[in-house]
């Protein structure tokens, strides 16, 4: 997608060679290890880095799996067990190991979310193109799915959009427009009219599940913190998600952060929980955890959740595993990638004092892009820059081919491989990609969109 020159190119090449060497050593040294009742050095080192980094001050346990969707399945099992114990649902140990189903456990989630393609992960997301009968005939949607407020840049202004389900008559213009993206994350908003509005809305939605005799329970909150990925690259108002977490804490509903997409510097910080200003009970990581080199995932959780599975009976344990759980090559890649991203000597984008990435996308160019008449919104955060094109009817949405001529031009004439999500296109650089490269790519995208004339 791009070429880097000089010393930085040599440094990145050196790091990649070192990563490949470590993976090769792990393959030769360990081969395949059945992880139950075993451990090896790469898995131990990776767990230490996870708990000392993204899990610092809240997590104490790591459960490995092979991909993000499976990490979500494990997280759901963890949250449901914790909820069931806290509510006294599993008091009778004899019944707890049978297949009796006298209650229904559901999730609280957001419309537009995406948590993976395995069956349980799909049940935890609202109806979408991914869950249609063509894709998943078993889908029923076991959750309460809320329509979230979103934040975006349009005409150079950072704005808040509220769904119809949330009444906005009490919000002033100052609550719906922000001088900068940093103001969106400001904790002073916790005492705003918007926070009260969100709290009332969420409480009303949860009220039908508050009756103690109800057989249906909201047993977990699962969200993609800040950015919804495959659902369209929407930025959810962080205040809404923060209030959502607070309301669930008050009701002893375990909180899951799906950071498969957002984790490990994707949004400019190591964990999106830093942007939200609140912590989960369970969080899932994959993708950039290994630098994108090989599949590996981790479900990270608290000691309290771990305790929910302790027992003298093996049947009470978390019986979820794979042949390639904590495979040594993946753990070695993760160790190297995590260290690489956190070290300013190998990641020149890292502001080590603040433990944040420097701004990668040129703000002036982003604002100019958002002001084009054929652009509906722009989301620019960390390594991500997403653009939604103005489109109506069948030209909008995931199934749309509206942007295909634009995509073809970018690929064939500009050497930029842009993946579309319907009428949404996006750029994602690496955490170590230089700002100059990002500006070069975004300038080409701006030029193409400014001359874009879709062919139907």
Predicted segments, located by residue:
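Conserved N-terminal phosphate-binding loop of PLP-dependent enzymes in the Aspartate aminotransferase
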Residues: 1-456
């Amino acid at each position: 997608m791009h070429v880097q020159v000089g010393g930085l190119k040599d440094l990145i090449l050196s790091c990649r060679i070192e990563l490949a060497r470590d993976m090769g050593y792990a393959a030769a040294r360990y081969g395949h290890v059945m992880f139950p009742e075993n451990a090896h050095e790469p898995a131990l080192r990776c767990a230490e880095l996870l708990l000392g980094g993204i899990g610092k001050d809240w997590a104490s346990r790591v459960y490995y799996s092979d991909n993000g969707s499976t990490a979500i399945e494990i997280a759901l099992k963890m949250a449901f067990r914790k909820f069931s114990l806290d509510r006294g649902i599993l008091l009778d140990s004899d019944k707890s190991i049978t297949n009796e189903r006298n209650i229904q456990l559901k999730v609280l989630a957001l419309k537009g979310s995406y948590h993976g393609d395995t069956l349980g992960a799909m049940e935890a997301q609202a109806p979408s193109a991914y869950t249609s009968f063509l894709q998943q005939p078993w889908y029923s949607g076991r959750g309460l799915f809320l329509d979230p407020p979103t934040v975006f840049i349009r005409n150079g202004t950072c704005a808040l959009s509220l769904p119809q389900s949330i009444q906005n008559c009490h919000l002033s213009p100052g609550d719906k427009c922000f001088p900068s993206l940093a103001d969106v994350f400001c904790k002073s908003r916790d005492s705003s009219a918007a926070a009260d509005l969100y709290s009332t809305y969420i409480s009303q939605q949860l009220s039908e599940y508050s009756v103690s005799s109800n057989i249906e329970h909201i047993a977990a909150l699962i969200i993609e913190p800040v950015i919804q990925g495959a659902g369209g690259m929407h930025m959810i108002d962080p205040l809404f998600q923060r209030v959502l977490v607070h309301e669930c804490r008050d009701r002893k509903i375990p909180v899951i952060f799906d950071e498969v997409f957002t984790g490990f510097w994707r949004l400019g910080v190591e964990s999106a929980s830093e942007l939200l200003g609140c912590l989960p009970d369970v969080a899932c990581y994959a993708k950039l955890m290994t630098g994108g080199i090989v599949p590996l995932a981790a479900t990270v959780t608290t000691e309290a959740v771990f305790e929910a599975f302790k027992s003298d009976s093996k049947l009470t344990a978390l019986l979820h595993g794979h042949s390639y759980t904590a495979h040594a090559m993946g753990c070695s890649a993760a160790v190297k990638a995590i260290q690489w991203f956190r070290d300013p000597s190998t990641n020149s984008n890292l502001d080590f004092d603040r433990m944040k990435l420097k701004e990668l996308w040129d703000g002036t160019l982003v604002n100019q892009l958002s002001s084009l008449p054929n652009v509906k919104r722009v989301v620019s955060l960390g390594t991500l820059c997403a653009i939604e094109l103005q489109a109506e009817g069948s030209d909008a949405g995931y199934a749309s081919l509206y942007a295909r001529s634009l995509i073809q031009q970018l690929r064939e004439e500009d050497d930029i491989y842009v993946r579309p999500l319907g009428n949404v296109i996006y750029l994602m650089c690496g955490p170590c990609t230089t700002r100059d490269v990002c500006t070069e790519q975004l300038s080409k995208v701006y030029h193409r969109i400014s001359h874009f004339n879709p062919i139907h």
